[in-house]
Amino acid sequence: MLDGHERTLLAAQGYSELSMYDDAIAELDTLPAEAVKHATVIELRAVILMQAKRWKSALTAARALCRTEPEKTSGFIHTAFCLHELGRTAEARDVLIAGPEALHIEPTFHYNLACYECALGNLALARLHLDKSFQLDKKFRDFARSDPDLAALRE
């Protein structure tokens, strides 16, 4: 379904890396309808919109990814992140918890849940998820040192 469209996808990624988000989206918009519905394209659109901090549009794309590939964990992580950025943190937490079982072995799942629980005032639960993210991937310890969403755990 994406055969012959690799150049367009690479161009969109390139524009995105240069922070030329409108151009990146414009590239994706040149794809035919059947390609636009492909999970790879939907996810790329969501990521570009997230980089551009266009949270409502990114949320729409991320939710489409969840519908298109309900077992793909990144759709749920992206959806939850957008909801959190829109100030809908409890909903973000609920989306992650309701996602596919495969999420539970991903450090990003636990790290983001820690951020959401911290924002919601559930510090003990936040600490549990944060520690689990560290167990799964030590690099999250570095992220946590400066993440404003986790400030309450550092106090």
Residue map of PLM features:
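Alpha-helical segment of the N-proximal tetratricopeptide repeat
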Residues: 3-34, 44-51
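Alpha-helical adaptor scaffolds
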Residues: 40-108, 116
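Terminal, low-structured helical/coil segments at or just beyond the last alpha-helical repeat
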Residues: 139-155
